[in-house]
A protein has these predicted regions:
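Conserved GNAT-fold acetyl-CoA-binding loop/helix
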Residues: 1-17
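Short loop/turn motifs at secondary-structure junctions and domain boundaries
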Residues: 19-24
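Conserved beta-strand in the GNAT
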Residues: 29, 35-45
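Conserved acyl-donor/pantetheine-binding loop and adjacent beta-alpha core of acyl/acetyltransferases
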Residues: 41-75
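Conserved acetyl-CoA-binding loop-helix of GNAT-fold acetyltransferases
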Residues: 72-89, 106-111
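Conserved GNAT acetyl-CoA-binding A-motif
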Residues: 89-101
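Conserved active-site alpha-helix within GNAT-family acetyltransferase domains
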Residues: 100-118, 126
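C-terminal "cap" of GNAT-fold acetyltransferases
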Residues: 122-134
Length: 134
């Protein structure tokens, strides 16, 4: 949770949520020589929390994939860039969101070609900065 001291609290992401990601085939691990150094969910299709945005998405007409729950063990740099590169082989239109306090993730998203589009609210009602790459 480097740079992410307030976004992942109170047991988030829960074991149940991660199990759902696995069951749907949406959870991916990044490993080298059998050692996991990163994890993320990649979900293709409409994200209900992205339906309402204070701002505007750049493209509402083409299918997109969303990167969620990206985490690393802190031993490598470029974990987000690696996840984005992989996701782009599946779909060229990507979205992501992060907490306003997670400046590290905001910078990484910008470097990975994402543009900040506005603010969305996640299921519990808290705001997140919304990003899109097309």
């Amino acid at each position: 949770t480097n740079g992410n001291t307030v976004q992942w609290v109170n047991g988030y992401p829960s074991e149940a949520l991660l199990r759902q990601d696995v069951a749907r085939g949406d959870l991916y691990v990044m490993e080298e020589d059998g050692v996991v150094y990163g994890v993320f969910a990649f979900i293709i299709g409409d994200d209900p929390t992205y339906q309402t945005i204070h701002g505007a998405w750049r493209d509402n007409d083409t299918p997109y994939g969303t990167l969620h729950r990206l985490g690393s063990d802190g031993t490598r740099r470029g974990v987000l860039a690696e996840a984005v590169d992989w996701a782009l082989t599946r779909l060229p239109h990507l979205r992501a969101d992060t907490h306003e306090a997670n400046v590290t993730m905001q910078r990484c998203l910008g470097r990975a070609g994402f543009v900040r589009c506005g603010v969305i609210r996640i299921a519990d009602g808290t705001p997140r900065l919304a990003y899109e790459r097309i």
